[in-house]
Amino acid sequence: MESTAIVPKGPVVGSEDMEKAEVIASGSTDIISTTSTATTTAAIGSVQEESVKQEDVPMEGGEGEVEEEEGETRCICGELDTPDDSGFFIQCEQCSSWQHGYCVSITQDNAPDKYWCEQCRPELHQLFTTDTGEARSIYKPVQEKRRQSRRKARSAAASKSHAANEAEKSPRNTSNTDDNVDDIGDEEDEVEDEASAVALAKDGNTRSSRRRRRNSMDDASTDQYSLDPGDSDKKLLDRKRATFMAREEKQYQRMLEKALKESRRTSHQEDPESYENDADIYQGDTDNHNGTTRLQTDVMLTEGKPDSVTNDDMKESLRPSKEQSMEKTNDVEKEASQEKESSTGSAQDTEKTDEPILPLTSISSSEDDSRKASSRGSKRVSKPARKGNRTRRSNTSSDTNQNRRSADIGTDKPVKPRLPPQRTSLNEMRRRVSAILEFISRTQWELSEDQSDREEFVRFVENQHFVEKVDTIYNGYNESLSMMDDLTRELLLWEKKYSNNTNAIQ
């Protein structure tokens, strides 16, 4: 508080007057300070009273809210207990009534902050009834939240898949040149592996050439990245064309081989002699390659021996091979004759067994002819093995057929009826009745046909005992027919009754 001095308006007379004026000013300041302190204390007291009043008011409101929260349970279903085991309730903001969360399609996980019942805010509810006649509701704000979350999840999944596809495409484009180079190298490796079977001594050279070519390819790929973008694109196109042409060439060679094999098979069916000659010519190269490799090994083993010894060894080594080839051809001829005698299968088997088998007229002293004969024998020996497999298959199929026949339901065994469930609709029952009526009509027709054959059974029979047995059988037929008639009558009455009722209801 600032003290204010009171200055007299009149003229100053003397020191006494000045002293009186100072005393008056000090007294006035004391009065002003006392009044200001009184006013401040009064203001503080009023503020405290107002704060106390404001604190008392929300307490009363809180008690009112507690009282309002204790509302009654008034659900759409009309029941007090929850229909599910969760026990989740939700309260209306306006009327404070409690409702089952299950009945309004709200769970504890997706419960909203504020909820209004169907009476206070009917536009937020979509009412419906279940199959059992129970009233239910769908709270629309919660449904909208679910839809939005589903849409977000779908969009996120779609964006992730799109990003993954783009990420896969980008490294493929960058590594395309390396893949093309590897494809060229792999195709060249296959061609060189086929050619390497000619001689064992050339394997090291082919491998070294392969490595050199691979290294040159890698150098070319590294140089490609160091060049300008235009040159790299051109080289990339050239690589693609080269790999495409190589693949086309490989595919063309495979197709040619398949066509040659098919033509040999057809020519074998028409002219077996020419087929054998072609097979000999076709296998000549591979046999010569194998023969050269074996002869090289024999020469390496017998380099230190004299010529006479080597000739004797060669003769002795060729004699058992000739004898083996003769024995194989004899065995093949015996098996072929046995196959012709025991051929009672299908037409394909007979055609294969009736094929002419040419005996070997002349056997040369070289290893190639013995190898050819052994290969022919192995090919011809495989035919009866196929027949044995077919006989096994036929035996297994006959066994399975016998098992199936034995597994059929017998007439003496009891059969359990298929009772309909309790919650079966009228349409389902009508369908069942029509199926039963159809079955009864078919069986009645079959039984009547069997009864008409009864006279043919007993026409030329004079033994009365046999006739009595036949009559007992057909008496059972009559009983079954009468039971079927009663059943059809009841089913027709049922169908007539309920079909009329359903038409009236519709």
Swiss-Prot record:
What's the miscellaneous note? Answer: Present with 1590 molecules/cell in log phase SD medium.
Per UniProt, subcellular location reads as:
Nucleus
In what ranges is there compositional bias, type Basic residues? 373-393
Annotated positions of the Phosphoserine modification: 175, 216, 267
Q: What is its main location?
A: nucleus
Q: Where is this region: Disordered?
A: 49-71, 138-425
One Gene Ontology molecular-function label? zinc ion binding
To which species is this protein native? Saccharomyces cerevisiae (strain ATCC 204508 / S288c) (Baker's yeast)
Q: Describe its partners and assembly state.
A: Component of the RPD3C(L) complex composed of at least ASH1, CTI6, DEP1, PHO23, RPD3, RXT2, RXT3, SAP30, SDS3, SIN3, UME1 and UME6. Interacts with CYC8.
- The entry's protein name is Histone deacetylase complex subunit CTI6
**Where is there biased composition of kind Acidic residues?**
62-71, 179-195
Q: What is this protein for, i.e. what is its function?
A: Component of the RPD3C(L) histone deacetylase complex (HDAC). Responsible for the deacetylation of lysine residues on the N-terminal part of the core histones (H2A, H2B, H3 and H4). Histone deacetylation gives a tag for epigenetic repression and plays an important role in transcriptional regulation, cell cycle progression and developmental events. CTI6 links the SAGA coactivator to the CYC8-TUP1 corepressor. Involved in transcription regulation of heme-regulated genes and required for GCN5 recruitment, histone H3 acetylation and SPT15/TBP binding to promoters.
Where is it found, in Gene Ontology cellular component terms? nucleus; Rpd3L complex; Rpd3L-Expanded complex
**Gene3D superfamilies per UniProt:** Zinc/RING finger domain, C3HC4 (zinc finger)
Could you tell me where the Polar residues compositional bias lies?
394-404
Give the record's GO biological process terms: negative regulation of rDNA heterochromatin formation; negative regulation of silent mating-type cassette heterochromatin formation; nucleosome assembly; positive regulation of DNA-templated transcription; regulation of DNA-templated DNA replication initiation; regulation of transcription by RNA polymerase II
Keyword Transcription, does the record have it?
yes
Question: InterPro entries attached here?
Answer: HDAC_complex_subunit (IPR053051), Zinc_finger_PHD-type_CS (IPR019786), Znf_FYVE_PHD (IPR011011), Znf_PHD (IPR001965), Znf_PHD-finger (IPR019787), Znf_RING/FYVE/PHD (IPR013083)
